[in-house]
Each structure stands twice: as structure tokens, then as C-alpha cells.
């Protein structure tokens, strides 16, 4: 082979080698561009996801605010409801006390009339007209007492009971061997209670 042929062959090999290098460079550039494109696509997707999150967050915040407001309103409602129930109980109790006081005044005014009726029933007589009239008065007395008892009136027990200064008024001392010391031997005037309130203490004779 001549020097000329060797030179041509070397040039040809050099050209092929340069072509291969250039092809490799082009392939690398293409791969780099593809990678760049993928990265950009991923960045766009992440940005889109962030935008979605940013759009959802205000809704969640609003829901939380509404829930907090609902909880506060529920707490206020429960507090007001409890206060209203206490108010109703207080008013009911006051009304009951007022009714008791009103009945107390009325019954206190009636007691002297009851005393007079009972004194009239103690009068004795043989006349038939008198007996008939007394029987009628007795029926009226029983009806009145029963009606008052239905409304809370109670006769205070006396004879044979231990003297109690809260419900009895001692006006006479007695010396009766049939009774213990401090026991009531005789009732001089009836006493009455309205539920737990003393309308009038009983006047009694107490054994010494």
C-alpha cells in the first residue's frame, strides 16, 4: 500500500470517528432535553397540586371556624337553658310560698269563726228544734274542717303530748298524777298548723 492510500484510509477512519462522536453528543443532548422536559412536567404537576391545596385550605379553615362557632353557640345555649330552668324553679318556689302566705292569712281570719262554731256545739238542749239546728251546725263544721284539712290545715295535738314551746302555749300549770311532768293535761284552745307553719299555737295546761 502506498503512502497515499494510507493517508486516505486514515482520513476515512477519522471521519467515521468524528461522526460517531457527533452522534453521541447529539444523543446526549436529546436525552438531556427529554430529562429537562420531564422535570418541567413534574414541576408543573407539583405546582398544580400546590394550587389545589391552596384552594382546599380556605374551605377547611372555614369549616373549622363554623365548627368553633357552633360549639360556642351550643355552650351559650346550654348555659342559658340552665339559667332558665333555675329561674323557673325559683319562680315556682316563690309562687308556692306566696300561695301559702295567702292561705295563711285567710285561714287565720277563719279560725275565730271556727272557735265560735265549736263553742255553739258545746251548748246542750233538749228541744227538738235546738237539736235539729245543732245537728245542722255540726254538719257545716265538719264540712268546713275537712275542706281546710284538704288545703293543708292541721290541728295541733295536745292532751297527753309532751309540751313543745314551738307549737304550744302554756297558760296554766297542773299537778295531775295521771300525767308525767311536762305533759299536757288539758287543751284550753285549739291550735292549728298550715303545712309546716304554725297559724296559732295551742293554749294548754301543763303538768308540773
Curated annotation (Swiss-Prot):
Subunit structure: Homodimer.
Family statement drawn from the similarity comment of this UniProt entry: Belongs to the GrpE family.
Entry keyword Cytoplasm: yes
UniProt protein name: Protein GrpE
PROSITE patterns: GRPE (PS01071)
Cystine bridges: none
Described function: Participates actively in the response to hyperosmotic and heat shock by preventing the aggregation of stress-denatured proteins, in association with DnaK and GrpE. It is the nucleotide exchange factor for DnaK and may function as a thermosensor. Unfolded proteins bind initially to DnaJ; upon interaction with the DnaJ-bound protein, DnaK hydrolyzes its bound ATP, resulting in the formation of a stable complex. GrpE releases ADP from DnaK; ATP binding to DnaK triggers the release of the substrate protein, thus completing the reaction cycle.
Gene symbol of the encoding locus: grpE
GO CC annotations on file: cytoplasm
Organism for this UniProt entry: Staphylococcus aureus (strain NCTC 8325 / PS 47)
A UniProt-annotated Pfam family: GrpE
Record-linked CDD domains: GrpE
Acidic residues bias: start-end ranges: 42-51
Region Disordered, residue ranges: 1-51
Subcellular location: Cytoplasm
Comp. bias (Polar residues): 13-23
